[in-house]
């Protein structure tokens, strides 16, 4: 799980980005590769080939990578770093469904390998709309690119961006195509949340500190809340988002991964498969959701006009590209229960949405109150539950909330914070998530990536919810004002179970 300080001793590598002229390359992938190079973490011979349908010259693509990195990188890239890579950056124009274009790409890779007289590792990064995942994967297989140096330390690898399907059936279909062309050890399904420092540290906090693991169970935990909220609307992604929605776009991947890491049992080792095995077991322990009736465990909503940060915001149906009869949810919350020894009876509350009160991603573990023998009888004590808040963004860090006596002649209680912030402790220039994930993929370490059965298990839980909502049409799609924390029914979901949402009050 821990990356080496340098991998310059590894074989030459070619990174091929499909969809290279897109926004992800400009904002994340280009800057990540150049930052890895600046830290001497790339192989000595490293090449970057952009692949796309546009006719772009090598010089134009180099300028695109350099300029976008200057704009989006977490730090200034040295001229020396750029010069060392510049001549190795090129662009290959081609179609995603034309096999001949993939043969041409293969010939380009062969020529580089012949020039170096050394076996080359290929890392194919699929950064395209999901509609072209299938032809890219099929043509990587048919052209022989997927099988290059199979079962050797330089075998080809492929990174696939989410979404990993739209439901269980499509996830199964995608995995079938992947498994037909690649071995699972070659496949890296990427969720950039897993590359964030706080998420990486979650297993360390749980299993390297004896104060947490003994109380990390149903005997001491009252509830777990996971929030991934955004204060922005759909902006220019209206067309894509309306085909997706909050459940598909955020909960099925980001939020469910956070749940798995929070709830999983200790792995037998830090080996990638040991960790991923336990994540799958945690997901498999989740009970099917109750989708209707008085005990329903799901809520959905759509934002209407409101105020966000003091400015007027339009409603979802007024956004560009959104049909007036849309039934897509921009907010979803769930109450999940686990059928296992550790978590039996502990609700896991999940929520995600757009145009909410603030941008925040965090896990809140609420512990049970102590017996109200000493401090619970008198209201002046104001006994609050202990909370462990794991902030993923913004301001990555961990805060433990405890009760303490306030100064004075009377015994009065007040919650206090024991806080740790990554930036305060380690400085602000920590690596971006994509840097860690690309480096791990180059090293063949799948710890922070999603395995095929993980994706299928998650979809197996959520597909019945999507089917129910589709059949209900607009019934139950509750409106909430932009700038609030979502539908009223989301509050009732917790209140009816003896809890309330904790995120967004005095945290973040």
Language model features by range: what are they?
Residues 1-160, 164-508:
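Secretory/organelle targeting and membrane-embedding segments
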């Amino acid at each position: 799980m821990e990356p080496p300080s340098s991998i310059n001793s590894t074989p030459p590598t070619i990174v091929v980005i499909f969809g290279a002229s897109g926004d992800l390359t400009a904002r994340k992938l280009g800057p990540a590769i150049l930052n890895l190079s600046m830290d001497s973490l790339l192989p000595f011979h490293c090449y970057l080939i952009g692949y796309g349908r546009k006719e772009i010259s090598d010089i134009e693509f180099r300028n695109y990578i350099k300029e976008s990195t200057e704009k989006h990188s977490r730090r200034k890239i040295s001229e020396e770093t750029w010069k060392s890579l510049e001549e190795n950056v090129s662009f290959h124009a081609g179609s995603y469904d034309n096999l001949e274009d993939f043969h041409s790409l293969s010939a380009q890779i062969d020529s580089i390998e012949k020039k170096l007289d050394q076996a080359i590792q290929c890392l194919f990064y699929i950064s395209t709309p999901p509609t072209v995942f299938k032809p890219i994967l099929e043509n990587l297989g048919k052209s022989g690119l997927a099988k290059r140096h199979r079962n050797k330390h330089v075998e080809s690898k492929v990174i696939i961006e989410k979404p990993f399907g739209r439901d269980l059936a499509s996830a199964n279909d995608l995995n079938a195509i992947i498994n037909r062309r690649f071995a699972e050890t070659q496949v890296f399904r990427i969720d950039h949340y897993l590359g964030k420092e706080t998420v990486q540290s979650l297993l360390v906090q749980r299993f390297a500190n004896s104060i947490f693991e003994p109380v990390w169970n149903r005997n001491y935990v009252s509830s777990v809340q996971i929030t991934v909220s955004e204060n922005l609307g759909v902006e220019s992604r209206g067309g894509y988002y309306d085909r997706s929605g909050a459940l598909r776009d955020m909960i099925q991947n980001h939020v469910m991964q956070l749940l798995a890491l929070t709830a999983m049992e200790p792995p037998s080792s830090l080996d990638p498969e040991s960790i991923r095995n336990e994540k799958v077991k945690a997901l498999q322990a989740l009970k099917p959701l109750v989708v209707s009736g008085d005990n329903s465990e799901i809520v959905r909503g759509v934002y209407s006009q409101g105020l966000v940060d003091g400015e007027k915001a339009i409603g979802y149906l007024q956004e560009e590209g959104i049909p007036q009869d849309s039934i897509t949810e921009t907010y979803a919350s769930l109450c999940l229960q686990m059928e296992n020894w550790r978590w039996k009876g502990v609700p896991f509350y999940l929520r995600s949405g757009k145009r909410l009160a603030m941008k925040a991603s965090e896990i809140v573990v609420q512990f049970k109150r102590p017996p109200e023998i000493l401090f619970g009888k008198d209201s002046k004590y104001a006994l609050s539950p202990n909370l462990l808040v794991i902030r993923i963004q913004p301001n990555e860090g961990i805060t433990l909330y405890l009760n303490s006596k306030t100064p004075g002649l009377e015994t009065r209680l007040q919650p206090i914070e024991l806080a740790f912030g990554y930036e305060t402790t380690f400085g602000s220039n920590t690596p971006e998530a994509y840097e860690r994930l690309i480096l791990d993929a180059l090293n063949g370490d799948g710890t922070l990536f999603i395995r095929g059965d993980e994706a299928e298990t998650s979809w197996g839980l959520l597909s019945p919810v999507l089917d129910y909502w589709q059949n209900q049409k607009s019934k139950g799609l509750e409106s909430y004002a932009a700038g609030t924390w979502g539908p009223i029914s989301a509050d009732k979901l917790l209140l009816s179970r003896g809890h309330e949402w904790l995120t967004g009050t005095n945290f973040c």
